[in-house]
Amino acid sequence: HTEKNAFAKGLYSTLKVPANLTKKILVKGTPLLFNETLWASAMAMLTQCYSIRGLNVVASLNISNTINNVFNIVFIALGDSVAIIVGQLLGAGDMKKARDTDNKMIAFSVMCCTCVAMVMFVMAPLFPMLYNTNDEARELAKYLIMITAFFMPQNAFLHATYFTLRSGGKTIITFLFDSVFIWCVSVPIAFVLSRYTGIHVLVIYACVQLADLIKCVIGFVLV
């Protein structure tokens, strides 16, 4: 088998990790570690900003986030596939094919998520009925799901471009593209609108989603 899989020769002969390999892992992996940590804390901060509008908002966010996570599987899976397939082509040194494949996969991801978003938008009034809560929370959850469905194609594009950048090894750029952007743009928008204005939480939520259009432009240029 060593002739067919030369890379596996001596794979289990030692647990020692060469220093130069460790350095490469740390250089590439550390930004991703910080990125995920900052992204999670940003999500918590956004939720806190929305929660200022009352307990019904908290309940509606829990409902909508649960439903959103089910439907988001589509663009998450397609984004992961971009990283795998494009990363393989980049590793083989076929830049032209990698770029062509990436463009097609991004377009496919956006089209698939557009179809899923339509289903999600139409079914939005039904999902909150599954939960034992008051009518106001159900109504808010319905509109939050609708807003998320409206922006799902945008999120599909962002996710695919994010994993395209990661597959190319541009971890610093993905760090800036993802968590730095959300802390510097999305969180301040939610913070200011929730604390210094009286606008409805649905408008705040939509404004935060709309801000990601800036990332779409950046992602389009970088990819």
Each model region followed by its residue ranges:
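Small-residue-rich hydrophobic transmembrane alpha-helices
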Residues: 60-124, 155-174
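Transmembrane alpha-helix boundary/anchor motif
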Residues: 41, 45, 69, 81, ...
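Hydrophobic faces of transmembrane alpha-helices in multi-pass small-molecule transporters and flippases
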Residues: 14-45, 70-74, 78, 145, ...
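Membrane-helix interface segments
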Residues: 56-57, 171-172, 200-201
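Helix-terminus/linker motif at the lipid-water interface of multi-pass membrane proteins
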Residues: 37-70, 88-89, 126-135, 195-196
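Short runs within selected transmembrane alpha-helices of multi-pass transporters and secretion channels
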Residues: 1, 76-79, 148-167, 173-185, ...
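Short alpha-helical transmembrane segments in multi-pass integral membrane proteins
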Residues: 1-30, 86-151, 193-223
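Hydrophobic alpha-helical transmembrane segments in multi-pass membrane proteins
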Residues: 32-44, 48, 76, 108-121, ...
